[in-house]
């Protein structure tokens, strides 16, 4: 299924958009997602970051994969409807950057 509201970006477009995000963002192995790992002190802060990402995602209507553990929270965006990256992934990543710095 192709999502015409958020078409799949070309690799060059995605690379350009990635360069505008916090330096912590990187392409995942297959290039079909972007990911940022945020280091923090302790488990409670990792849970807080995960909840912050989840709350923000719910308000945006674009939900990342979020993993966390003691001292870290990882957020991964992709657009499943296009089997790759869309503008929405980069907008959501930029908004996450604004939240966590």
What are these regions (language model features)?
Residues 1-35, 41-101:
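Long, contiguous binding/interaction regions
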